[in-house]
UniProtKB/Swiss-Prot annotation:
Catalytic activity from the UniProt record: pseudouridine(54) in tRNA + S-adenosyl-L-methionine = N(1)-methylpseudouridine(54) in tRNA + S-adenosyl-L-homocysteine + H(+)
Protein name listed in UniProt: tRNA (pseudouridine(54)-N(1))-methyltransferase
Organism: Thermococcus onnurineus (strain NA1)
Record has Signal as a keyword: no
Subunit structure of this chain's protein: Homodimer.
Single GO term (MF): S-adenosylmethionine-dependent methyltransferase activity
Gene behind this protein: trmY
Binding-site list for S-adenosyl-L-methionine: 135, 156
Role: Specifically catalyzes the N1-methylation of pseudouridine at position 54 (Psi54) in tRNAs.
PANTHER family to which the protein is assigned, alphabetical: TRNA (PSEUDOURIDINE(54)-N(1))-METHYLTRANSFERASE (PTHR40703:SF1)
Subcellular location: Cytoplasm
Transmembrane parts of this sequence: none
Keyword line: Cytoplasm, Methyltransferase, S-adenosyl-L-methionine, Transferase, tRNA processing
Gene Ontology terms: biological process: tRNA methylation
Key word S-adenosyl-L-methionine present: yes
Amino acid sequence: MRTFIIKANKAHTKADFKLKDLPGTSGRIDLLCRVLNSAFLLSHGFRKNVRVWLSLYGPPNPPKAIRFEGQGMKPKTLNPDELSTAKLIIKALKVGENLREPSKEIQVLPGIYVSNLTFEDIIRRTLKGATLYYLHEEGRPIERVNFSQNVAFVLGDHEGLTPEDEAFLSGIAEKVSIGRKSYLASHVVAYVNIFLDSITPPP
């Protein structure tokens, strides 16, 4: 199983943005849509062995967590275009509007869940079943890492993780790198998937 956890510090936690202007009104929900597509979609297929957590910390009601489970999702739920993916996020945010309990998850659609879990909650839950890595330019080259069958990767949005987030990850997540340059989050996820596909047996 492969898990991708992306912390989006400005992504809106309410469906109050415009689909026609995702970059300008949503806190970069468009970036999260591209991450989801890179995580799950193949040219003629769908990755069932992937889980994605979107950890949203933008206005007005942070945090919100949206979990996408490849094993539970119907392949046709996720399409290549950003707008239809953004509509899934909007649906999840609307379903989660009245959530009060911090640990309760509500199913939005098969394989898609929304909650008020914090970034730290997600990390702690993930650590119970996977080895955790922090994708960072200054990390160990990914080619030199021996990966287990259950792996999880943490990455930030266009602004990266906060110093507090990095301090929390210190000691529990090894830094790994796909290169010394800063790449788009969706490209990083695509690269990691392709690299893991080449391992025998792949996670």
